[in-house]
From Swiss-Prot:
The protein's name: Non-structural protein 2a
The organism's place on the tree of life at top rank: Viruses
Signal peptide stretch: none
Family note: Belongs to the coronaviruses ns2a protein family.
Pfam families the UniProt entry points to: Corona_NS2A (PF05213)
InterPro entries given in the database record: Coronavirus_NS2A, NS2A-like
Species lineage: Viruses, Riboviria, Orthornavirae, Pisuviricota, Pisoniviricetes
Amino acid sequence: MAVAYADKPNHFINFPLTQFQGFVLNYKGLQFQLLDEGVDCKIQTAPHISLAMLDIQPEDYRSVDVAIQEVIDDMHWGEGFQIKFENPHILGRCIVLDVKGVEELHDDLVNYIRDKGCVDDQSRKWIGHCTIAQLTDAALSIKGNVDFINSMQFNYKITINPSSPARLEIVKLGAEKKDGFYETIASHWMGIRFEYNPPTDKLAMIMGYCCLEVVRKELEEGDLPENDDDAWFKLSYHYENNSWFFRHVYRKSSYFRKSCQNLDCNCLGFYESSVEED
């Protein structure tokens, strides 16, 4: 079966960099060099890495959102990994940095999103890069500008681990920028699986089938299967594996949060909880 590519993309998976202050300080240093040299260019105000291009519609957002969370859940952190930025150069009309260390993350995102039936990646080879600025046509034709850009030096590393402020986001092409970030459709901290921890080994220790209808009413339609056996399997599986759907239900269902906090359920009204939500 032929693979569909996002050669006319309308969204992308974003790895924002503004929250890494040390990197941004050095990144802006490069931009100041360009301006001081008088290079006619448009400065990038939201530093980032585009990890995958997408050709999707709003009805695909949820599938891509879930795929991102599954990639995060399946990451094997070890001691973390490093992202290396180096070699300022011209790529097309842009001045960019080479980016190394995110190739596996790119591949995982492409495969997980594609497994959801969504169109992603491009037919041309993906090149990890971080845009510094975009040159005007006039600036690109000036040999002195090209020579200056090719002489620039940059070498910086970021270590990514579960406590890092690293995020994966769905962004629409042309989205507005504010304070160094793109407006996002969805955004997930890459260490999110450690944000909430299931309080018991088994879901059955704090609630039962009697709770499913209460929880279902607080979720979006279709989140939990209508069949109680299927719904229980889905919820308990994600609860016991501390994966994305557990956190989704924890965020959306106040009843489920209280059950986790109390280590017990109240679906039959046997007690009044003394625990208040934060």
